[in-house]
Amino acid sequence: MRNIKMPKRLLQGVVISSKADKTVTVKVERKFKHPIYKKFVKVSKKYAAHDSENKYQEGDKVSIIESRPISKTKTWVVVNGE
């Protein structure tokens, strides 16, 4: 059996909370066209991401990448921000 690695997902969003130590909450929005009503719908989701240096604050735009589980809810890591 061969070990084939899947590419890790990369998402972009905005930090909405940085109160926890080494953790930020990132809100990721996506738009898609509804298949029946043909209207664009905006959907958002929140992810807990690991920020090892505590350098991102609320309002920062960041990119997060999927990683191994760090805790019960954290499976994403902040890779860079603006």
Swiss-Prot record:
One of its GO terms (cellular component) is cytosolic small ribosomal subunit. It comes from Rickettsia rickettsii (strain Iowa). It comes from the Bacteria. One of its GO terms (molecular function) is rRNA binding. SUPFAM superfamilies: Nucleic acid-binding proteins. Part of the 30S ribosomal subunit. InterPro entries: NA-bd_OB-fold, Ribosomal_uS17, Ribosomal_uS17_bact/chlr, Ribosomal_uS17_CS. HAMAP family: Ribosomal_uS17_B. The keyword RNA-binding applies. Pfam families: Ribosomal_S17. PANTHER family: 40S RIBOSOMAL PROTEIN S11 FAMILY MEMBER, SMALL RIBOSOMAL SUBUNIT PROTEIN US17M. PROSITE patterns: RIBOSOMAL_S17. One of its GO terms (biological process) is translation. NCBIfam families: PRK05610.1, uS17_bact. This is Small ribosomal subunit protein uS17. CDD domains: Ribosomal_uS17 (cd00364). One of the primary rRNA binding proteins, it binds specifically to the 5'-end of 16S ribosomal RNA. Belongs to the universal ribosomal protein uS17 family. Keywords: Ribonucleoprotein, Ribosomal protein, RNA-binding, rRNA-binding.
